[in-house]
């Protein structure tokens, strides 16, 4: 029964992938539904499209630096940018202050998230837009979201426009504290590891095993991390 179920599911997925591509994919441009409201991000998340689909997504949000997405699309958009190593584009979107951004609401003095990021609407209670916040400790500090473990692997990223960051998370109830500061192309990366945790850092393709207590690493950024 298990194999039959798997075969059926695979067949359904193949059918719908083909149907969605036929209905929405523009073979001339490489985009789905003209890329409106993060359509290309949804396609990439489903394993659809080609290299142009990613290129179009990056180009659009590099220029606009604003969200035209709903709360699900906002999450998927940021997720896909990060999944394809477009950290700077994602960071620019999340830190923007133009109309249609989180910073725009903050600039207006709002303390909650509107239903539409670019239009003042009757509903000012859409906290689900804030789901993208989960990427901040994971990406900026490298803290994994798997908390019930004593094996912790840090994979930090360093956005071009961010000079420093700090934060912590608990693993098996024990803290890992991270803080870093950037000077030119050099990162001073400090980590406190609680007793009983095995922690390592992966950066620039190199793995460094940390010891309990205070650790400090000097990381040289690669050229493509500052472009």
Question: Model features per residue range: what roles?
Answer:
Residues 1-123, 211, 218-221:
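Catalytic cores of carbohydrate-active enzymes
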Residues 11, 15-18, 88-227:
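Non-catalytic C-terminal accessory modules of carbohydrate-active enzymes
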């Amino acid at each position: 029964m298990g194999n039959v179920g798997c075969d059926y599911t695979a067949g359904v997925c193949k059918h719908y992938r083909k149907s969605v591509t036929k209905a929405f994919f523009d073979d001339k441009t490489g985009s789905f539904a003209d890329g409106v409201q993060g359509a290309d991000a949804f396609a990439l998340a489903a394993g659809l499209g080609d290299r142009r689909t990613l290129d179009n997504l990056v180009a659009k949000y590099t220029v606009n630096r604003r969200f035209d997405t709903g709360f699900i699309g906002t999450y998927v958009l940021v997720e896909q940018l990060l999944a394809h190593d477009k950290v700077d584009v994602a960071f620019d979107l999340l830190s923007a202050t133009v109309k249609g951004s989180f910073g725009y609401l903050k600039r207006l003095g709002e303390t909650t998230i509107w239903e539409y990021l670019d239009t003042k609407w009757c509903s000012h209670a859409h906290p689900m837009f804030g789901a993208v916040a989960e990427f901040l400790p994971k990406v900026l500090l490298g803290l994994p979201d798997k908390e019930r473990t004593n094996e912790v692997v840090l994979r930090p990223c360093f956005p071009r426009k961010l000079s420093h960051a700090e934060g912590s998370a608990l693993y098996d109830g024990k803290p890992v504290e991270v803080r870093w500061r950037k000077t030119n192309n050099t990162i001073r990366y400090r980590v406190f590891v609680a007793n009983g945790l095995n922690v390592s850092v992966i950066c620039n393709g190199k793995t460094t095993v940390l010891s309990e207590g205070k650790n400090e690493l000097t990381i040289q950024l690669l050229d493509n991390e500052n472009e």
